[in-house]
Amino acid sequence: KVLEVRVVADASIAYEDFGAGDPSTMNRETVVQKLLKSGVWPVIRQRPFDLVADPAKEPKSIFVSCFDTNPLAPDLDYIVHNHANEFQTGLNALSKLTKGKVNIVVNSKTAAREFLDAKNVVRQTVDGPHPAGNVGVQIHHLDPISKGEQVWVAGVQDVLIIGRLFL
């Protein structure tokens, strides 16, 4: 019979350091291994079917939707504000994962310099009511998937997390 269970905190908290590094100077395998080892890899999803991306495969392209039309969706311009370095570093890491394009899809009314000044990407502009901000709709119109192909997607907040991992 168990009368009591005590959970006692450690005197100090320790985190594993995955090390900083510029992803633009790394090869694909190094970027993939760092994302896998750190546990960040599952934020990268593959379409069709919205599964966790298979690191052994290479996508046709990668999409980052910077425009969300879902009801009650957060303002992505606000989320990325003052995080240009993290966002660009995350995009640089994603660009190592494909020989194709990294597309960022923005609203035509965006004022976020972090989106407008992004480098090493193809900026696509969309406008309109929901579902214009849905990444699946964006892929369908901008870079349709054919049989046997994959397109990977990551959200703005995911790109920021990836960027912070490398900084």
Spans of features found by a protein language model:
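Buried, small/hydrophobic-residue-enriched core segments of structured protein domains
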Residues: 2-167
